[in-house]
């Protein structure tokens, strides 16, 4: 017996504002039913010795510590800018 009906598929499609044909609804019903069946098979696994996890891989901070460093001299920065004035880089206006 199917756990997900064609009517369920049509209802969810309607909620998601998706227009699907009857043939598509039947196709999706079979696919979703197969997914639910597979998920139910996972419930049969013996996981008594498996520790609960929140991540598959161990989490570690890959970011470096935020340490201030001496920047480039203003002249060095401005020589790469297409336009500058009063030691500031000029850019085209973004807002009117």
UniProtKB/Swiss-Prot annotation:
Q: Which family does it belong to?
A: Belongs to the GatC family.
Q: Which UniProt keywords apply?
A: ATP-binding, Ligase, Nucleotide-binding, Protein biosynthesis
| UniProt keyword Protein biosynthesis, yes or no | yes
Q: Which HAMAP family match?
A: GatC
What the entry lists under Pfam families is as follows: GatC
Say which enzyme class the record assigns: ligase
Q: Summarize the subunit comment.
A: Heterotrimer of A, B and C subunits.
Q: What catalytic activity is recorded?
A: L-glutamyl-tRNA(Gln) + L-glutamine + ATP + H2O = L-glutaminyl-tRNA(Gln) + L-glutamate + ADP + phosphate + H(+); L-aspartyl-tRNA(Asn) + L-glutamine + ATP + H2O = L-asparaginyl-tRNA(Asn) + L-glutamate + ADP + phosphate + 2 H(+)
What exactly does this protein do?
Allows the formation of correctly charged Asn-tRNA(Asn) or Gln-tRNA(Gln) through the transamidation of misacylated Asp-tRNA(Asn) or Glu-tRNA(Gln) in organisms which lack either or both of asparaginyl-tRNA or glutaminyl-tRNA synthetases. The reaction takes place in the presence of glutamine and ATP through an activated phospho-Asp-tRNA(Asn) or phospho-Glu-tRNA(Gln).
Protein name, UniProt field: Aspartyl/glutamyl-tRNA(Asn/Gln) amidotransferase subunit C
| Single biological process term from Gene Ontology | glutaminyl-tRNAGln biosynthesis via transamidation
GO MF entries: asparaginyl-tRNA synthase (glutamine-hydrolyzing) activity; ATP binding; glutaminyl-tRNA synthase (glutamine-hydrolyzing) activity
Enzyme Commission identifier(s): 6.3.5.-
């Amino acid at each position: 017996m199917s756990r997900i009906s064609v009517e369920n598929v049509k209802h969810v499609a309607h909620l998601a504002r998706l227009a699907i044909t009857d043939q598509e609804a039947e196709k999706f019903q079979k696919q979703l039913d197969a997914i639910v069946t597979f998920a139910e098979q996972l419930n049969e696994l013996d996981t008594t010795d498996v520790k609960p996890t929140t991540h598959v891989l161990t989490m570690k901070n890959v970011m470096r510590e935020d340490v201030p460093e001496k920047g480039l001299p203003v002249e060095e920065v401005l020589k790469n800018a297409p336009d500058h004035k009063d030691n500031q880089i000029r850019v085209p206006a973004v807002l009117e």
